[in-house]
Each structure stands twice: as C-alpha cells, then as structure tokens.
C-alpha cells in the first residue's frame, strides 16, 4: 500500500507527474511518478514504507492543481469470478473504513466500466458490512476502489476531508437549458470547488454587484443573474436577450482588459481567451487595487510545460499582490469542465483588527 493514484483530465498525466514529483522532492519522499499518455491517471510509486501515507498527510488535496482525486494503496489483479473473496483477502491488511466509493477513470474504457461498478457495488458493500470492514463513520478513511478494467483495481484509501468531494473528482452538474452556453458550468463548478456550500448565501448573495469580463454570449453572466446579482457584462459581442430582459444586466461594449468599474464590486469573473501572462496582470490589478472582493478567472495554458507555466503564473500573481500590500488568498485548480486551462479563485482577506 505504498503507491499514490491520481486521477486527472486525459492528456494531463505529465502535469500530474511533474506536480506530485515536485511536492515529493520538497518533502523528501523518495519515489518516482509514472503514467501512460491519455490514460486519465498517474501513479507515484514510493520507495520507502509509508511514503504514500506521508504525502497525503503533509499535502492538502485542495492545494493541488491538476489531480482530480487521489488515494494511497496498490493495484490488485482480480479473477473472472469470486472477485469479492479476493478483495476481502487483500482488504484484511487495510483499516476498517467509514465509506466506500467505486471509481473509474475518465476514459472510454472507464465509461464502459461504469455499469459494472454500479452492479458490483451492491454485493461488495453488503460483504464489507457483513465482515466488519465497512462502517458508516465519516471519521474513518474512505475506501476508494478504482477499476482500470474488470480484472484490475486499485485498492485505495483517502481521508474524506482531504480528497475530492465527488467520486473521481467529477461534480454531477446539470446544464441549465436557459443558459446561453455550456461554459456556464465552469463557473458553477468553481463555486462548488472553492466556496463551502454553507457560505453561498453570504458570499454569493442576492443584490451583490459583479463584473463579467469577456461576457458574451453570457454563460457566466447567467450564473450571476441566477444568484440575483447585478451584473456589468463587458464584451464587444452580443449578449443573450434573455439575460438583458432580466433587468439585472448592464451590457458595456468595451475591451475587458481596459474596463474598470466606477466603484468596487463584490465579484469579478473572467473567461477571456488570452495569453495567461496578460490575464495574470489583470488579476493583479483587480485584486491589488481593490476593484473587487472575490474573483474567478480562467488562465489558458500553452501546449507544453503547463505545470511549470502554472507555477510561474501563481508565483507572479502572489508576488504582485504582495508588492501592492494586498492580502489575498489564491487557489487554483483544473476543473472537470476546464479544457486547456485552469481556474483561479481569489479572495481579498479582511484587514487585521
């Protein structure tokens, strides 16, 4: 049980390997990362006993950028029949767990296994409960079974408060038919990712003011309007008429990189296709000058060296805000609905009393 399995978006396995390898080096956890292209997962194999557990103890999952989910454990080969008996034998070396998730990888093979997992979960859960291997206790580790095929599974453990909030790290969001574009789901997922659900009524409250830079046709604006915020939509392109009819949207035809609000707003959101360095400078201006209280901004990534680019951009943003004397929390994640991009959440911190 000394490997770390990390789920990711297909095509970003190299970024996961670079990111977890960098953290392991900093923490002096010996091992190596490996992955196959477009397999939707990577594995960090630790050379020392307890290495995977130490990595998960020392790192906060919320602080990782490219992994969607993680678990410590090992791959196990399964027979064509009597799979549950073999699993119970291996799980005898695992602690009693408080919850169970059956997961697949975000690949064509993974999608084909989804039906198998749904059917297999019922008898497996029953067997685990009968043998005392599974209790209903959120304080205990979660048992994560990631099936790479019907004959191979990763038996993993993760702490519920230090792993993904959803199986495979994929939120089950429904596309609202009224929204003018599917990009609307990126902003909704960002809120789920970065803002505790119990804080939504306070931090995403009706009547708040918001600016959407590069708004047309209004996918992100729709989310803001759906929370009954007053929105300034900045874009030279046309906005969906349904949003304009809401009475909550002012359409300003201007360059999103030039526009500045007359007074500070509660929220700024931005999903403009632009070089990430220019977008990072925009973040520094808006948060550094106090033009908004919170922001969700997408950074478009190059084709190569994407982990290194994200690290440089985050360092630049943090250094730039610090130089302006602004106290701002900065978080970054590649969301499920992101493509060749990552999403940043920034929040100005209250001045010390």
From Swiss-Prot:
GO cellular component: a single term: cytoplasm
InterPro entries tied to this protein: RlmM_FDX, RlmM_THUMP-like, RNA_MeTrfase_FtsJ_dom, rRNA_MeTrfase_M, SAM-dependent_MTases_sf
Catalytic activity: cytidine(2498) in 23S rRNA + S-adenosyl-L-methionine = 2'-O-methylcytidine(2498) in 23S rRNA + S-adenosyl-L-homocysteine + H(+)
Top-level taxon of the source organism: Bacteria
Pfam short name (any one): RLMM_N
Primary location class: cytoplasm
Active site per database record: 300 (proton acceptor)
GO biological process, one term: rRNA processing
SUPFAM superfamilies noted in UniProt: S-adenosyl-L-methionine-dependent methyltransferases
GO MF terms held by the record: S-adenosylmethionine-dependent methyltransferase activity
Binding site for S-adenosyl-L-methionine: 183, 216-219, 235, 255, 271
Location in or out of the cell: Cytoplasm
Binding partners and assembly: Monomer.
Annotated function: Catalyzes the 2'-O-methylation at nucleotide C2498 in 23S rRNA.
Protein family membership: Belongs to the class I-like SAM-binding methyltransferase superfamily. RNA methyltransferase RlmE family. RlmM subfamily.
NCBIfam families reported in the protein's UniProt record: PRK11760.1
Name assigned to this protein: Ribosomal RNA large subunit methyltransferase M
Organism the protein comes from: Azotobacter vinelandii (strain DJ / ATCC BAA-1303)
Lineage summary: Bacteria, Pseudomonadati, Pseudomonadota, Gammaproteobacteria, Pseudomonadales
């Amino acid at each position: 049980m000394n490997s770390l399995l990390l789920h990711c978006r297909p095509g970003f396995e190299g970024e996961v390997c670079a990111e977890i390898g960098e953290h392991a080096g900093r923490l002096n956890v010996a091992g190596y990362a490996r992955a196959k292209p477009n397999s939707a997962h990577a594995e960090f194999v630790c050379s020392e006993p307890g290495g995977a557990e130490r990595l998960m103890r020392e790192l906060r999952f919320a602080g990782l950028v490219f992994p969607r989910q993680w678990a410590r454990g090992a791959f196990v080969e399964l027979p064509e029949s009597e799979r549950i008996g073999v699993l119970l034998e291996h799980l005898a070396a695992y602690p009693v767990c408080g919850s169970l998730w059956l997961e697949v990888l975000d690949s064509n093979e993974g999608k084909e296994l989804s039906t198998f997992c749904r059917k297999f979960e019922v008898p497996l859960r029953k067997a685990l409960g009968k043998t005392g291997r599974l209790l209903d206790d959120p304080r205990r580790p979660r048992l994560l079974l990631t099936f790479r095929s019907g004959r191979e599974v990763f038996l993993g453990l993760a702490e519920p408060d230090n792993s993904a909030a959803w199986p495979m790290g994929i939120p089950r969001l429904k596309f609202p038919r009224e929204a003018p574009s599917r990009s609307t789901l990126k902003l909704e997922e960002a809120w789920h990712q970065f803002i505790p659900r119990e804080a939504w009524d306070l931090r995403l409250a009706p009547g708040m003011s918001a600016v959407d830079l590069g708004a047309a046709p209004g996918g992100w604006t729709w989310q803001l309007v759906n929370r009954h915020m007053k929105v300034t939509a900045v874009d030279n392109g046309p906005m969906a008429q349904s949003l304009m009819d809401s009475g909550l949207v002012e359409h300003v035809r201007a360059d999103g990189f030039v526009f500045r609000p007359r007074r500070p707003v509660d929220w700024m959101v931005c999903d403009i296709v632009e070089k990430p360095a220019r977008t990072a400078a925009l973040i520094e201006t808006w948060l550094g000058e106090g033009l908004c209280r919170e922001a969700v901004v997408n950074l478009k990534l190059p084709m190569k060296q994407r982990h290194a680019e994200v690290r440089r951009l985050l360092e630049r943003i943090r250094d730039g805000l610090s130089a302006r004397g602004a106290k701002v929390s900065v978080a970054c994640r590649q969301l499920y609905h992101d493509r060749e991009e990552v999403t940043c959440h920034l929040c100005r911190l209250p001045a010390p009393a």
